[in-house]
Amino acid sequence: MAWSPLFLTLITHCAGSWAQSVLTQPPSVSEAPRQRVTISCSGSSSNIGNNAVNWYQQLPGKAPKLLIYYDDLLPSGVSDRFSGSKSGTSASLAISGLQSEDEADYYCAAWDDSLNG
């Protein structure tokens, strides 16, 4: 049985009602099943550099689900195939042992201090 590439779609996080993009993700990433993929999220000192990063997974037709909180913590019930990390003004979500059900939209999110006031 031949494996077809798994296609994970990523969408850039938009902050606030202004829909101002403050975090940058690649538009998409793909990898074969059972492999590992890393999704990057770049920001600045006012968001990722100074605040916690959360990651969300949105399956087609479903509400977003929290995958990672406070940079690298897994909520109860989330597979340990998912892991988060942060360094400076960048964060990453890694998914190991890719499965077909991982095909989804993935969002990174962090508060941006410049939006205060």
From Swiss-Prot:
InterPro entries: Ig-like_dom (IPR007110), Ig-like_dom_sf (IPR036179), Ig-like_fold (IPR013783), Ig_V-set (IPR013106), IgV_Light_Chain (IPR050150). Residues 73-108 are annotated as: Framework-3. Residues 109-117 are annotated as: Complementarity-determining-3. PROSITE patterns: IG_LIKE. The keyword Cell membrane applies. One of its GO terms (cellular component) is plasma membrane. Gene3D superfamilies: Immunoglobulins (2.60.40.10). It comes from the Eukaryota. Residues 20-117 form the Ig-like domain. Residues 53-69 are annotated as: Framework-2. One of its GO terms (biological process) is immune response. V region of the variable domain of immunoglobulin light chains that participates in the antigen recognition. Immunoglobulins, also known as antibodies, are membrane-bound or secreted glycoproteins produced by B lymphocytes. In the recognition phase of humoral immunity, the membrane-bound immunoglobulins serve as receptors which, upon binding of a specific antigen, trigger the clonal expansion and differentiation of B lymphocytes into immunoglobulins-secreting plasma cells. This is Immunoglobulin lambda variable 1-36. It comes from Homo sapiens.
